[in-house]
Amino acid sequence: MSVKLRLRRIGRKKIPVYSIVAADQRNARDGRYIEDIGRYFPLREPAEVRLEEDRALYWLENGAQPSDTVRSILRRRGLLLHHHLKKKGESPGEIESAVEEFRERMAEQGEEVKIAVGTRGQDPLERERERAEEIDEEAQLRAQATPLSAVQEETEAEEAEDVETADAEDADAASETDEPEAAADEADETDASADADDNEEPEDE
């Protein structure tokens, strides 16, 4: 049986918490496992890891292969270095001294690791968390933009209706103005014709 050290999700929706487990690599990610050896809290600042180091070393010595994220956790805690030195035959004292020195170096570089967010060395879970936050922000922006678009469309429709109403009123007013002017012109023509008839002289018989 091929054993893998990997993460198994146990957290609530949008609040992920992971068990660090030894499991048959043929099983589903969140399925059956052989042993639970720790917890990983990626959303805490900084991310928190609780790990039974002796059990992690036991599984490494028995050929278990860590996933990328678990490998990163083990490396930062000096367990991969411990396993490597033990395979080389170093004494327990030398191993402990080397691991302690490595952990001090990692602690000094802690701020540099935080600043390097977004680089190739970023943990897969960190990338997943940032991607989830980006999706949530995009959804919120879309939700805010939709009502504004609806209001804008309604306003434009009302403005178009007002323009049509104003044009119709102008047309009616122009029509009413033309009718009195036409009647006045007709009356003027009638008066002029009557004056012309009065001014005609009678013909001699």
UniProtKB/Swiss-Prot annotation:
Pfam families: Ribosomal_S16. Residues 110-205 are annotated as: Disordered. Coiled coil: none annotated. One of its GO terms (cellular component) is cytoplasm. Residues 123-132 have a biased composition (Basic and acidic residues). Belongs to the bacterial ribosomal protein bS16 family. This is Small ribosomal subunit protein bS16. Keywords: Ribonucleoprotein, Ribosomal protein.
